[in-house]
Amino acid sequence: MGQTKSKIKSKYASYLSFIKILLKRGGVKVSTKNLIKLFQIIEQFCPWFPEQGTSDLKDWKRIGKELKQAGRKGNIIPLTVWNDWAIIKAALEPFQTEEDSISVSDAPGSCLIDCNENTRKKSQKETESLHCEYVAEPVMAQSTQNVDYNQLQEVIYPETLKLEGKGPELMGPSESKPRGTSPLPAGQVLVRLQPQKQVKENKTQPQVAYQYWPLAELQYRPPPESQYGYPGMPPAPQGRAPYHQPPTRRLNPMAPPSRQGSELHEIIDKSRKEGDTEAWQFPVTLEPMPPGEGAQEGEPPTVEARYKSFSIKMLKDMKEGVKQYGPNSPYMRTLLDSIAYGHRLIPYDWEILAKSSLSPSQFLQFKTWWIDGVQEQVRRNRAANPPVNIDADQLLGIGQNWSTISQQALMQNEAIEQVRAICLRAWEKIQDPGSTCPSFNTVRQGSKEPYPDFVARLQDVAQKSIADEKAGKVIVELMAYENANPECQSAIKPLKGKVPAGSDVISEYVKACDGIGGAMHKAMLMAQAITGVVLGGQVRTFGGKCYNCGQIGHLKKNCPVLNKQNITIQATTTGREPPDLCPRCKKGKHWASQCRSKFDKNGQPLSGNEQRGQPQAPQQTGAFPIQPFVPQGFQGQQPPLSQVFQGISQLPQYNNCPSPQAAVQQ
């Protein structure tokens, strides 16, 4: 039957406990063995069923339909499964709103047919499956008759029953009568519970009495905080703010339905069905109070501040995000901004949010930067004209006047905004463990790094190292050009100091560097290097210095100064035109001193036109005399070796050198 009993019990442990307590308080006892059997069948035929369970009646009706389809296909469904399914579905009916209730049962009409008549008409094989399909319906009817709906409603809606006895303004005239259970007719099945039927028939009862109330009332409520901070003392009077506040209203479950905010109610109802209604609770909400006696026209309305703590799910998401991505990752910054601007957070909320999400060292950094930001903000408040009456105790949530939650809930909107800005900036300065904040001077763009990535790194370092926002912006604009690579600098240089007023300098720089490093940009650079023409509004020239004049932009062979001098010298030295043919190469009209040919007109090599040096005499380095090789037949024609040496010794330039004979004798 799918998974074993132990796996089913561990998988749906919390949901099984909830179902058992719900049925027990409603007057129905179901054994754990039968519930495990039910969830084994659900696990087999309904794989979409969530592990955390569901309290939506539509899901349980869908389970019934799929189990009936499985029975029609020949699968055996035990009777206890049908019985437990019907009891749980009936117990979950009070959780549904009137819009979710259904007046007609989704059970097929053939449920009223006697099972014995079907077994006579069908074969033995079909009887077994039909028995599982239809016999459960009378059992469901018998099981639902013993449910004490008044007791079950008392558990689920405790505050609703209290409100019913307070006054006639919250209930209809027919609600004062006790609600009793009428016995079900024999042989018929009624899927909906009797209290839901009475609510629908009674038109005088408010339709939203059961909307958005159960989960809010089932939450744990701490004891009221006394004026002196000790539990058990008389509660302090509810604080009221005499100043004007925005028309923020608390979601009142007993308020009459209205068209305004219908989309918000739909979102809350959807999240409630998904099991995440706590995420829509605001820590501090302001509810306008009705005008009292003697109130004058035009007087700002008095509002009542109410506080609700963060949900466990929200704190868990923050903790997992910080642990997995880091406190200053883009995901965490977006999540923190949505919480900060979507809620009215007081200093106590920021402290709880930081303590539950950050490590001890990170929380110490956050607290340090928080205090530093408060001191700076207090100096600005005092220097303002007129001065702002917001002190450091209010921004930190300390002192005799701002230490309790009820006192912080009455903070002005301006103080709430200042606390939000200070805490967000303190959060941005938190460093990860083991990492150090580099200086903005060391942040340089790589040769292949995109320019937007370089600017993002530069802005991040500037935010963490520079406290003043204006100074940080100036530093970023300066370093965005100075620390960029040469290609981006050449693209930004025409825009430097020429960005029109009102435009973002960094945005213009990013636009100018768009496409640098790509294939198109590389092709443009190659074309500019080859042709030297203007492409894309830029001129690429030689960046080295000329060895002749020392200027940048050309080589020595292309130096205009040298070319001009050569032309002048040639014009002054020649003075007359060259002959028809060169006397050296015989193939050009130029002077022999200017001839650079290596071959003459017949293709014979020509000697160089440079002056030759004097030839050097041979030197004997060995101990044996040199015997020149003389072929046979020519021995008599060659002079003796002594005469050769004697002639060489008579050369004037070698008079100081020893003779070869002396060298041989030595």
Swiss-Prot record:
Myristoylation is essential for retroviral assembly. Alteration of the glycine residue leads to a block in the budding of particles and an accumulation of Gag inside the cell. Specific enzymatic cleavages may yield mature proteins. Residues 164-183, 598-642 are annotated as: Disordered. GO terms for molecular function: nucleic acid binding; structural molecule activity; zinc ion binding. SMART domains: ZnF_C2HC. Residues 604-622 have a biased composition (Polar residues). It is found in: Cell membrane. A lipid is attached at residue 2 (N-myristoyl glycine). Belongs to the beta type-B retroviral Gag protein family. HERV class-II K(HML-2) gag subfamily. This is Endogenous retrovirus group K member 10 Gag polyprotein. The lineage of its organism: Eukaryota, Metazoa, Chordata, Craniata, Vertebrata. The gene is ERVK-10.
